[in-house]
């Protein structure tokens, strides 16, 4: 066994050493015609001789049969590939077995022939495509180099265009902040009423009066509605008291006098009759006789609140010039007081008639004598202070009008103080109205 293995090894080594070294550029062909065609296509100008046949003749028969079997399947590969060596393939079929044996090593290298023939054909389109691709790449690079510059310019322009957009967004945010701060304005005014006015704040209010108009107009309307409701309630109260007097006792008549005389100064009617305007002294005299002491305090409070009602509407000052707003405020107050005064003037004669009818109806003689005695006294007292009360009412209304030109620089501080006073006055008026209604019900 060892001998056989050594023999086979030596045969293999001899066959390997006998094989020619295949060149990458030249393929050896069995025919001379094929050699001539190859020479025209190869780079080498010299003809290539076939490999020597001596070592192959010395080979044993086993290697020859193996090589012959290997050559048979490889021949169709040579014929299958189209090449100018196809006419040489026909004489190759007539070659003897010895030539096949001798060309066996050449046939092993035969697959390199079509590769060599196709390589230049493939290289040509590759070479043609290479410059085209190079041109395309150059164009792309040129475009990419040009495009960044073109893109950089719009970016620069965009950056320049976006710069003015930032203030617009800030303006919108400022508008939202102003809208959010509007409901907090009364709180700020109430707190700063105690502090001295800052001219910068006044200038800011003068510059931007438009967005503040709706809120302040609503507040003014609310105040006016409250005043109208109070006037209507005051006008209805004497009528109710007049209806209650016919069935009441003479003592009730004196109470109705006191009620009428407490209510009349709250209206402070300028155009009403002197008896209606000067009811407060008669009320004090009647209350002194009847012993009703706590009502003059309410009366004083009511007169003070009515006198202070004129500057309540000074919250309109930022909406227009100072003098015009204050004059219009006085006119509005007069217009409001006129219907209230008319209703009071109508109610007072009716109450006097009811009192006159109630006094002689079923009252005892002493009380009946007291009531007529009180009437002439009230008339005497009314004639003297009637003009004084009317003049006082006119002066109270004329004071804010006279102060309007001189009070312009002090507008902001006065407005803030007036707002706080108006709030306090409204609270005191509401408390007084509740107390008066409770006392009348009792």
From Swiss-Prot:
Which positions make up the signal peptide? none
Q: What segments bear the compositional bias annotation Low complexity?
A: 159-172, 241-255, 272-288, 357-376
Instruction: Cite the record's Basic and acidic residues compositional bias ranges.
Output: 55-67, 114-125, 133-146, 177-194, 204-240, 329-339, 408-442
Q: Which domain of life is it from?
A: Eukaryota
Provide this UniProt record's keywords sorted from A to Z. Answer: Developmental protein, Phosphoprotein
Q: Give all Phosphoserine modified positions.
A: 430, 433, 436-437
UniProt keyword Phosphoprotein present: yes
Expressed, tissue-wise, as follows: Expressed in the embryonic CNS, in sets of cells that are segmentally reiterated along the periphery of the nervous system.
What does the protein in this record do? May play an important role during development.
Specify the protein name.
Protein bangles and beads
Q: Which organism is it from?
A: Drosophila melanogaster (Fruit fly)
**Gene symbol?**
bnb
């Amino acid at each position: 066994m060892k001998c056989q293995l050594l023999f086979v090894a030596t045969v293999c080594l001899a066959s390997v050493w006998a094989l020619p070294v295949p060149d990458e550029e030249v393929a050896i062909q069995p025919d001379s015609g094929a050699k001539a065609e190859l020479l025209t296509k190869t780079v080498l100008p010299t003809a290539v001789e076939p490999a020597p046949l001596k070592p192959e003749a010395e080979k044993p028969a086993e290697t020859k049969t193996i090589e012959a079997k290997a050559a048979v399947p490889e021949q169709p590969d040579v014929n299958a590939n189209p090449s100018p060596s196809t006419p040489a393939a026909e004489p190759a079929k007539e070659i003897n077995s010895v030539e096949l044996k001798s060309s066996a090593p050449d046939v092993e290298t035969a697959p390199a022939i079509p590769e060599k023939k196709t390589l230049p054909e493939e290289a040509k389109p590759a070479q043609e495509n290479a410059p085209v691709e190079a041109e395309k790449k150059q164009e792309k690079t040129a475009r990419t180099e040009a495009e960044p510059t073109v893109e950089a310019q719009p970016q620069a322009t965009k950056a320049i265009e976006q710069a003015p957009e930032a203030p617009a967004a800030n303006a919108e945010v400022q508008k939202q902040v102003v809208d959010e701060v509007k409901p907090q304005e009364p709180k700020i005014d109430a707190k700063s009423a105690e502090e001295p006015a800052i001219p910068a704040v006044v200038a800011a209010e003068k510059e931007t009066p438009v967005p503040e108009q709706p809120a302040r107009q609503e507040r003014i309307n609310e105040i006016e509605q409250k005043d109208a409701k109070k006037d209507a309630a005051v006008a209805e109260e004497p009528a109710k008291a007049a209806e209650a007097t016919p069935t009441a006792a003479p003592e009730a008549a004196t109470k109705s006098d006191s009620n009428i005389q407490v209510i009349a100064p709250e209206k402070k009617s300028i155009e009403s009759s002197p008896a209606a305007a000067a009811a407060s002294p008669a009320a004090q005299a009647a209350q002194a006789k009847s012993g009703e002491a706590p009502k003059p305090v309410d009366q004083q409070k009511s007169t003070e609140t009515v006198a202070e009602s004129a500057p309540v509407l000074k919250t309109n000052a930022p909406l227009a010039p100072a003098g015009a707003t204050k004059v219009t405020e006085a006119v509005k107050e007069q217009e409001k007081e006129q219907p209230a005064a008319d209703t009071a003037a109508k109610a007072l004669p009716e109450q006097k008639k009811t009192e006159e009818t109630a006094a002689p109806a079923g009252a005892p003689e002493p009380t009946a004598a007291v009531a007529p005695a009180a009437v002439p006294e009230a008339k005497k007292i009314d004639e003297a202070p009637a003009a004084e009360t009317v003049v006082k009412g006119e002066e109270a209304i004329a004071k804010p009008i006279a102060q309007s030109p001189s009070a312009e620089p002090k507008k902001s501080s006065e407005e803030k103080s007036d707002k706080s006073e108006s709030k306090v006055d409204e609270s005191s008026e509401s408390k007084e109205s509740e107390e008066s209604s409770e006392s009348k019900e009792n």
